[in-house]
Amino acid sequence: MWALTVFVTILAAAIPITGVTGVCEDMAGNGRAPGEVWTEDSCTLYECGEDDSGELNTLFVAGCPLSLEIPKGCHYEPRSGNFPYCCPLLVCPDYVDKKNVRRRI
């Protein structure tokens, strides 16, 4: 068998905390400094950064795909841990020497 973990990157604007410059606000309302990276319970990786003008803070988000077309004979296996290890693992049969093996690509 072979296995594949896929994640996508999405850009989303973050709202700076009122009265505070140079910070992004996480989902819990905590201030995050530019360049700071953290994960949330939703299996998502966040990074606080500045846009090209240097004035606005931008939250760069990477997360697991919501859905992908699953090839015939394949299935997703749930996983746990911090991003990206919490993303489901796509497992497919791979017939090598008539054995089923798992391979991460």
Curated annotation (Swiss-Prot):
GO terms for cellular component: extracellular region. This is U-scoloptoxin(16)-Sm4a. The keyword Disulfide bond applies. It holds the Pfam family SVWC. It is found in: Secreted. SMART domains: SVWC (SM01318). The keyword DNA-binding does not apply. Expressed by the venom gland. InterPro entries: SVWC_dom. Its main location: secreted. One of its GO terms (molecular function) is toxin activity. Contains 4 disulfide bonds. Residues 1-22 form the signal peptide. Keywords: Disulfide bond, Secreted, Signal, Toxin. It comes from Scolopendra morsitans (Tanzanian blue ringleg centipede). Belongs to the scoloptoxin-16 family.
